Amino acid sequence: MRPLRHAVGSSTVTLETDLTLFPEDLHAPLLGSAGNATVDELALAARFDGLHQLLYTRGGVRPTNAAIEEVGKLLLLRLWLSRDDEASVDGVGLRALFDGAVPDESVVEVTKKAFTQVLTVDRMSLRAVDGSSRPLWPYDEPFRLAEPTVLQSALALVNEILGGGTRVADPLGTAFDAFLSGRYDHSGGLGTYLTPSSVARMMAEVVLDLLSSDALADVRAPIIADPFCGTGRFLVAAFDAAEERHENVDLAGLLDGGLVGADQSTTAIAKSGLNLLLYGAQQPEVYAVADSMTDPGLDRLRGTLAAVLTNPPFGGGKYDDALGIDRTRELFPSVRPNRPMDPRLLDSRCLSNFCDPGESLG
């Protein structure tokens, strides 16, 4: 067992990790979206697991989804610092905040103000369906982590993740993997189910092998989408697979407009957009929609995409949107109008419509 001690402010927080054995409640998935789990990824998952325990027992942030939300906000702040070394709030530089130089008595207030400010920075935003910019979180979204010692530890961990100058595969997905397996998440369901990263990566590799290199060489419009994007796991898996398996890929074009995500959940959109920003996107195209299958903004993609990668919603006869049911009856005439149905039927009908004829749906 190797302790990781962070001296932050006036406190020292110790996170226990073991890089040779998984914690008893952490299984051994292929963490992140990398094809093979590296020591760095396993160490990151172990640190997230330790941070999860701190947040849950001492941070006052529950449930797991809320804890991951606060970690995501800190990742956004650290990314802002990476893109602007002079970033500051009320005369306090973000560099000092992440280096542990802000004392415990003021670290919470400084972090709250910094988070409010970063939401107004245009180059840390998302691109909406109409082409305008919008913040990852609403402008009035609060920063909720208010225990100074735990916040200092979280700042130190985030600084480690983004301060090394190398890209970390799917950090938010890795956080979910670790947090979802955490031993303290027993008070109610999370309501979030992630496709295992190994499955997402396998699907991305198969689909990307079917695409021609020419399709990826000059990306000027959306070519790969996930209409139910969650944390963006399929989108970053597609990017990783394209980067590794094709030559002369327009990586910048792929990140800024070539990959498109949509989701009903605004918090999922924040995580997905942040994941793409962490990969280098300048302004990711991820949208919050009322219904991914009937949203007018997504209708523009129908019949245009080279690939759709997704894990659609499922379960029960609970879908009752009249337009969605009418669209489904075009493929499944036996579906009764004006009666709730299993959303998987709608997904089969409409997801195939997103793709250009002859292209791939995963």
From Swiss-Prot:
Enzyme Commission identifier(s): 2.1.1.72
Catalysed reactions, as listed in the record: a 2'-deoxyadenosine in DNA + S-adenosyl-L-methionine = an N(6)-methyl-2'-deoxyadenosine in DNA + S-adenosyl-L-homocysteine + H(+)
Transmembrane segments: none
Stored PROSITE patterns: N6_MTASE
Record's keyword terms, sorted: DNA-binding, Methyltransferase, Restriction system, S-adenosyl-L-methionine, Transferase
Entry-linked InterPro entries: DNA_methylase_A-5, DNA_methylase_N6_adenine_CS, SAM-dependent_MTases_sf, Type-I_RE_MTase_Subunit
Top-level taxonomic group: Bacteria
GO biological-process terms attached to the record: DNA restriction-modification system; methylation
Pfam families: N6_Mtase (PF02384)
UniProt GO molecular function: DNA binding; N-methyltransferase activity; site-specific DNA-methyltransferase (adenine-specific) activity
Keyword Nucleus: no
Role this protein plays: A gamma subtype methylase that recognizes the double-stranded sequence 5'-GATNNNNATC-3', methylates A-? on both strands, and protects the DNA from cleavage by the MamI endonuclease.
PANTHER family in alphabetical order: TYPE I RESTRICTION ENZYME HINDI METHYLASE SUBUNIT, TYPE I RESTRICTION ENZYME HINDVIIP M PROTEIN-RELATED
Family, similarity comment: Belongs to the N(4)/N(6)-methyltransferase family.
Protein's name according to its UniProt entry: Type II methyltransferase M.MamI
Biological source species: Microbacterium ammoniaphilum
Record lineage: Bacteria, Bacillati, Actinomycetota, Actinomycetes, Micrococcales
